[in-house]
């Protein structure tokens, strides 16, 4: 039988129609000491007793969501629905991962960013500010998505690519390599931006590929 690393305390809150309980560590593990208070979960299904995974501060995990491995949910972050956060992934700020979304590896989600639908964020990717990743979108490797950028449908952002500002990547579009898409630019259909290319301003990339050192606005 696995050793329990935390317990549900009697301190509870009502959130989204559910009762969540603050957790308290029963043992020392990682940087957590026995007796440390954590964040809030609905039940023990939400946080594994194995590994160093932890929910701290006023973070909340509920529904069928699962946090495991060495993942950390901090500040006022939320994980809900059937979402999973694992590996060494971390959620900060007021970020939210919900529905069937998965965040894993060494990925970070912070600020007021949202990852939902069946989206995946993994590798060393970072999603922050007010960025939204949803649908079946993927953000991975060392990619960063921030500002008010939206990535959705079957779009992918990876490599060392950056998507920010009010940029919008959707349909089956891809942004990768060292590419940058920003301002109000939109990449969609089967379009792609790669290598050291930059797409910005009010540019619309519809089913074509921008590569090398090209700049389009």
Task: Annotate each predicted stretch with a short phrase.
Residues 1-50, 212, 217:
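Terminal amphipathic alpha-helical/low-complexity segments used for targeting or macromolecular assembly
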Residues 51-209:
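A detector of tandem-repeat and repeat-rich interaction/domain scaffolds
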